[in-house]
Amino acid sequence: VTMSALFHPRKALVSAATLFGIAALGLGSGAEARPRAPKAPPGGAAVVVDYGVNLAGFPIGTAQISGAFEGSRYRMDVSAQLTGLVGAVTGGQGSARAAGNLSEKPLPNAFSIATRTSNSGIAVRMALANGNVSRAEITPPLIDMGDRVPVSAAAKRGIVDPASALLMPAHGRGDLADPANCNRTLPVFDGATRFNVVLSYSETRQVDKPGYSGPVLVCNARYIAIGGHRPDRPGVKFMEDNTDMSVWLAPVEGARVLLPMRISVRTTLGTNIIEATRWTRSGGAPTAQASLAAH
């Protein structure tokens, strides 16, 4: 199974599920994520979330999201790392960054990602104007096998990149724990492949993690291929038929956004789970409950 198994079945870097959008490119990070205090922009909020990655009950890596929010602007840095025997064999590592503006969904203006295994690597850079792709470069270029579904120009408008896809702006001005904040479609484009991730509300749970104690929204997830995929590949059909995927969303203090607390994805090798081990914030409201009550 791959780090990209969540939304990009064609890649085979061992370690399914790296945080929704980043999973799309089979990402890992060159250095193990360590808890650190995020630096909030003046008048804004920042958060760092550290994760453990498990496959079929075995720990295989770590991941980290770092987000900064100031007014309508955001920046997202995402990384992950394969550890133990899997990491020693594959050498998987990488990092991604996105920046843009927040509206009903993230409107990215720039995205970049670089990944590497022991025997290969890939880099993607995209320039966008409020979520509309103006340029995308992949190094090395993908090999055209002649069986990929084309990505239309229309499909490259109003998209979110893999890193921005992790960021869920709250709907309206209501409670951040409103179940309606689950219900959304993420139109993801990773530079080569266009797909939708459809989220729907399942339930609300209470969690207690270092740095965060409070409600999380449990959202079911479905994958829908749009373009750039190879429809005859078994992995594509597996993911489109996969009904055993979910994400837990937690509110970010001082910002009207939610980030993943936990992601679970069934794969052909077992269930992959990415779960937060630490939630570190700066700026914004002093407590999660105060932030929720303020809105």
What are these regions (language model features)?
Residues M3-A17:
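Bacterial N-terminal signal peptides that target proteins for export
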